[in-house]
Amino acid sequence: MRDDTSYLESQLITYIGNKRSLLEFIGQGVSVVQNKLNKDKLTCLDVFSGSGIVSRYLKQYSSVIAVNDLEKYSCIINECYLSNPTKKELEELKELYEKLTAKIDRKMKSIESSRAKGTYKNPGFISELYSPADAENIQKSERCFYTPYNADYLDVARQLIETEIPEKYKACFIAPLLSEASIHANTAGIFKGFYKNSKTGIGQFGGNGKNALTRITGNIQLNFPVFYKNDCKSYVFNQNANELVTSEELYKVVKNNGGVFDLAYFDPPYNQHPYGSNYFMLNLLASYQRPDTDLISKVSGIKKNWNRS
């Protein structure tokens, strides 16, 4: 990265097929296109953006970048990390961040106090449906994706983002929260299931081997988003890829380049396993709409109407 390596190394989601280790190789392809077209800055298209890491990488080489994904969480991630806040907007974001995190901390202290007093009431559906009530006494009927503290934090933070943050800035706070929710989950990387005790079938943090407990039980903390400031214009689409590539709307963003993209990156799902169910939790946090408990799977709590592509 030319200026800030933290932009490519932090606030990422844990993701199947993440291409972070291949960025240098992808960069070789970028150089080929630059040399062939005799252009330093390219118009770029990422049709299956996923975690957004390739789009972040391409941003430094782009005058225009258009990205797409069928999943809402991916779109929010790209809206945040491909943006170019002005100096004034950065100041506003920092002020909002300080106020927001202070409110989250106050609310979490209140919740922790209520736990100690035995008057705890879950603050939202993540703690209600996807976390045990007591980490030391997990019941067979309870899902175990997050520690009680982290589930409470996700609910509190997401609710306050919804009520306290202006619409145009929400993605800049939801995206870092999605990263934390991805990292500090009691899973091996996808949300199809959570670690359990194989003998009892009861949820257990880290499973029998107590794997990755530092990661799983570490407290979630909302971070200020990382940005890479340049003159690249970004456009985020939330469409079926087959429909997007034939739509006039897509090519309007590169009308100043003859309606064509210099470089198109296609990285479709590598197998039949659907991302809509593998990462359903991130979509729940993205929309923050409580699922109908009659319409979610019994074991993992996956919404039955997840996106199918």
Language-model segments: what does each one mean?
Residues 1-48, 53-60, 75-77, 84:
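S-adenosyl-L-methionine
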Residues 3, 23, 28, 53, ...:
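SAM-dependent nucleic-acid methyltransferase catalytic core
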Residues 34-41, 111-118, 245-261:
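Intrinsically disordered, low-complexity coil segments
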Residues 61, 83-84, 253-257, 276, ...:
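Glycine-rich, phosphate-binding/catalytic loops in enzymes
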Residues 63-68:
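Short beta-strand element of Class I
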Residues 71:
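Conserved SAM/SAH-binding beta-strand->alpha-helix loop
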Residues 80-143:
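Conserved phosphoryl-transfer catalytic core
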Residues 307-309:
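Conserved Class I SAM-dependent methyltransferase catalytic core
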